[in-house]
Each structure stands twice: as C-alpha cells, then as structure tokens.
C-alpha cells in the first residue's frame, strides 16, 4: 500500500509553516507523496531539503483539480477524509485497515486547510474524525497514520539519508554524512 496526502486549500503566507509540518509529518509517518492544490515554492523547497538530508523517496506535487485527482485515484484506491465531523477513529480504524489489506489498494488521505467542499465528503470512502474537539490537522494526520501503520513507521530509516538519529536514553546520537 502506498499512502498519499491531499492538502486542500493551502493559503500562502498564512499556511506555509503548518503546510510544511503537514508534509514533514506525512513523510515521517510513511506517506510517499503530498499533493497540494496551490503552488508554494517555500513549502516545496523545505520538503525537498528534508528529503535530501534525511533520505527517502517522498514526492511533492501540485494539481490543478483536486476533484479530478481524487476521482482518478478512487478508481483503484481508497479515499479517507480526515474531518472532526466524521466517524469515530476508535470505531472505524480496524475496518479501514482490513479494507486496505484485503483489496491491496493504495490510500489517499484528504486533509483541509480551510472549509472543505461538500464534494470531498461525498468522494471519500471514509470520513473519519480524530476526536470531536478543534485541533490541528497535523495532529489528526499523525494520529491516523500512526494507527494505520500500528507504529511501524515511527523509526523508519532510509539508506540514502545523510543524517540519522539513533534513539538514546541519555544523549544525542546523530550521524551526519560528510560531503
């Protein structure tokens, strides 16, 4: 299964930091691509710098029509929309994991920056809530991806990484490849 994240409604200066965090969280927790609906050179460059230093094969893409992208993806994939108005993650997560496992389909995860159009709810196979209180889309994304992968991606390492951190009880253990 390949995981892609579709970020709806990035709002330039206002969202560049949170959108960068969405991308970095996606990458760190197992996604292979993030798709934006708005061009933002700053976010793209930040993500590319992280991938260059920390490794992996994470892609950044901008699409003109999120609707077209989602409809095409849905032909051979499962679409999950994270929203505080969806079904309770504790009640539906097992079903989502089983659906992905038995169909061997890829996953598109939709998260919004602003008010999400009604059509996103209709296109999604699952509208999922991570709690029913206001919080960050980064938190919802991290919780969902961790539950989906059952924690298996938390300590991922990449062969092409120039920087690697080794968990330690008492010290900072960082390996930095010299150029």
UniProtKB/Swiss-Prot annotation:
One Gene Ontology term of the molecular function aspect: tRNA (cytidine(56)-2'-O)-methyltransferase activity
EC number from the UniProt entry: 2.1.1.206
Entry GO terms, CC: cytoplasm
Residues holding S-adenosyl-L-methionine: 82, 112-116, 130-137
CDD domains noted in UniProt: aTrm56-like
Record bears the keyword Chloroplast: no
Pfam annotation, one family: Trm56
Keywords, ordered alphabetically: Cytoplasm, Methyltransferase, S-adenosyl-L-methionine, Transferase, tRNA processing
InterPro entries, per the entry: Alpha/beta_knot_MTases (IPR029028), tRNA_m1G_MTases_N (IPR029026), tRNA_mtfrase_aTrm56 (IPR002845)
Top-level enzyme category: transferase
Subcellular location, record wording: Cytoplasm
Catalyzed chemical reaction(s): cytidine(56) in tRNA + S-adenosyl-L-methionine = 2'-O-methylcytidine(56) in tRNA + S-adenosyl-L-homocysteine + H(+)
Chief site of localization: cytoplasm
NCBIfam families reported in the protein's UniProt record: PRK03958.1 (NF003048)
Role according to the record: Specifically catalyzes the AdoMet-dependent 2'-O-ribose methylation of cytidine at position 56 in tRNAs.
HAMAP family linked: tRNA_methyltr_aTrm56
Assembly: Homodimer.
Name of the molecule in the record: tRNA (cytidine(56)-2'-O)-methyltransferase
